[in-house]
Every structure is written in C-alpha cells, then in structure tokens.
Amino acid sequence: NVLVKAYQLSKGNPIEDTMDIVTSVQEQVELQGATLNILGVGTTGYAKDVLSDVLGADAAIVETVAHTESALQFYDEVDVICDVGGQDIKIMILNNRQVKDFKLNTQCSAGNGYFLQSTSQDFGIPVENYATEAFGAESMPDFGYGCAVFMQSDIVDFQRQGWKKEEIMAGLANVLPKNIWLYVSQIPNLSKLGTNFVLQGGTQHNMAAVKSQVDFIESRFRGKAETANIIVHEHCGESGAIGAGIEAIRLWENGRETTFIGLESSKEIAYQSTTSEDTRCYFCKNKCLRTFIDVKIDHPIEDKDEQFTYKMGAQEPRPVRFYSRSKEKKEFESKVPLEAGAKRLIVGNSCEKGLVEDVNDMREIKKGLDAKLDANPNFIELAAKEIFQSFQPEVISDAIPKIQMTANQKERKSLMENRNKIRIGIPRVLNMY
C-alpha cells in the first residue's frame, strides 16, 4: 500500500530534488502523528546510480523493470505499459505478466513530457494548467509527428499563421500518441499487442495528453472484435518509484538490512558542483564536459581503491561512482581541489573512462573494458567484416578461350582488370548499413 507520496517537477539537480521529496514525505507522515522507520530504499531513473551512492540505497533498478513491477502490483490484467516521462518514452509489451518486448526512444525527445512542459512555459502557462487551456480550443493545427526539432519549427509556423496558444497546445497533445506509437515504437497495429493498456509516467497528469492517447488507442480497435481497456495508473507520476520500492521490500523480506543513511542525513547533504574546462575529460575523442559533485555525507563510503569495481574483474555490474584521492597516490593533484572529508561524484561522462580524473585509474578501467571485449564477441565489428567479405561464386563454365574478342568482350575484360582498383563504401549510421 502507498501511505504517502510526493511528486514534483525536476529542478535539474537530482540531489536537490531528492532532499525536497524526502522532506515532503516526512512532513506528511509527522502531520498524522506518526514516525517513519525506513527499512529499505530503492532508486530508479536517470539518476538512480548517483542517488543510490549518495543515499546508501539498497536497490537501483532500471526504469523498465520498475514500471513493470508497479503496473503488475496494482493491476491483474496488463498487456501493454506505456510510460511517458519527462525525458523519454518506454513501451513494455507483456504476455502472461512477463515482459516479452519493449520499445524505448533513446535518440529523440519527440513527444516527451518536458517538450510539452517547455512549450507551456514559453506561452506563460503553468504546466498544471495545460489541459485546461488545451480543452478550451475550438480547433487545432495538424502537427506532423516526428522529430522534436521539426515540431518546434511547426510551432513557429503555426503562430505566424495566426493559431492561438491554446490551439497549438491542443495540437501538440493530439500528436503525442502518434509520436509514441508511430514514431518511437513503430507499432501501428495496437490490437495485436492485447487489450489492456496501462498509462504511466508524470505526463499522464496532463489530461489533454491522456485524452489524446485514449482516443488514439481506441481508434486502432475500430472494426475489431475486441475493445481496448485503458487505465491510467492511480499513482502515474510515482509509478517508477513504487517499482523501486517493491524491490527494496523484496530485499528486506529476504533479510537484507538497509544501508540508507537516514532521513535527517538525507536532508542535510552538503555538496558543491563544478562544471568548467577543468572538468572536461580527454580520455576519449568525445571530450565530455563533465560535472564534479563533491558531496559531504556522514555514512561511510570506502576509498575508491578499495571499491573501484573494474579492478575486481569484468563481471561487476557497474563502476562505483564515488571517487576520492588514493592515499598511495599523493602525486596526483586534481585541477579542481577536493575538500578534506568530501567524496567526488563525476557525472556528464558518456563512457566509463570519464568516471575518474587520474590517467592511471583510467587505465585500470580500460583493462576491465578490454577484458569484457575479449570475453564477448563484438557483433558490430563482425557485421562490418562480413558485409564487405569477398564473394566467390561457383564456376559454371570454362574460361573464355584466348581468341579474337568482340568490343563487348574487350570492355568486359577491361572491367574485370579494373575491379581490384575500385572501392565501394556503404554508409553506416547508428551501426546500421
């Protein structure tokens, strides 16, 4: 059962957001004359690993698992889970309560909640009033579904044509399900997935977005023998968090003692973030502009050399993100000094090598990555070799005798001789030829 819950739009810093949420939850409980006793904590979402390390959480699970756990906890019949969050869209397709397939948008922000939120703010309307404004429109422009960049351009064009802000907002809500089902998941025939749809994620607080999704899904069942059963998760904004909590409960029931730092400590986390050229990573060609978050917390976190997972072998699930200067490596000095007693958290890196500052530590990470590459085949590399593999067809006749050749035969011979001098390239984009 969900006793209390807290939800807010992200302010851009997961640590600050978490401190606000924890304070809100505690206040709700204490207003009822009760006291919280935390037996387990789970995290999920993009900042799950960061928050897990800072809070001492017991579980950090991926969003697809968290949302599936949450839906199955509240509803017996689930065929499709559609999570529309602030940054992405996730579709989980189930069979007998087991996930058999899922779709994610990892490259484009089309149709996500933040796009609707930012558009609403550009019009000077709080996102909480989005649906009220959109439902007040008597007509709406027809947006083409697809890339968010093109949709932003469409907004400008429609404004020039005289469309009102509420009409544009209605049009954006109306195109949302097309982005979900036709652009991201590319599943036009929804009826083949099943009949029970659960809508989750913070965007489902926007009733204009919900209505457009319901209308679209129902339209895909017209003329079919079955009808769609569409449910908005009763805790849609917190559905992922509930799934993470379910995993924490499971660990507690199996005898796991929580490592959570405590409510008071979590509200008093002191940190300082730095983003500058001094934090830029040069360990690969990406040259990521990283952010260093120096955190002061009371609960113990071992020094990096004792907890640096890539030194323990290639089977570790992920590298620990907290970094502190090794006592044995006093010769290394960071460009951004680390205050005594603080632990450094490095974010904004696109690969594992950017988790550290010292080149020697980076080499240790690379050893672990190389070990993984040696232990597992690189299918992208194999495909690149196979697609350009020389093809030798069977010989079906004897060679052409050396006699007087016609013009066509001479041309063919010339082409055959020049074949080894010709290179043909096939473009590759996102590992697809």
Which residues make up each language-model segment?
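Glycine-rich phosphate-binding loop plus the immediately following alpha-helix
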Residues: 5-15, 19, 96-139, 152, ...
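Glycine-rich phosphate-binding/hydrolytic loop that grips phosphoryl groups
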Residues: 69, 113-118, 231-263
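Glycine-rich phosphate-binding loops at beta-strand->alpha-helix junctions
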Residues: 44-47, 175, 188-220, 234-237, ...
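Phosphate/ATP-binding catalytic cores across multiple sugar-kinase/actin-like superfamilies
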Residues: 21-24, 28, 171-194, 402-411
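Active-site nucleophile and cofactor-binding loops and adjacent substrate-binding regions
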Residues: 8-11, 36-43, 58-67, 82-86, ...
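Adenine-nucleotide phosphate-binding core of ATP-dependent small-molecule kinases
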Residues: 153-183
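Gly/Thr-rich phosphate-binding beta-strand-loop-beta motif of the actin/hexokinase/Hsp70
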Residues: 1-3, 78-98, 139, 276, ...
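N-terminal glycine/serine-rich phosphate-binding loop of ATP-dependent small-molecule kinases
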Residues: 1-61, 215-232, 252-270, 274-277, ...
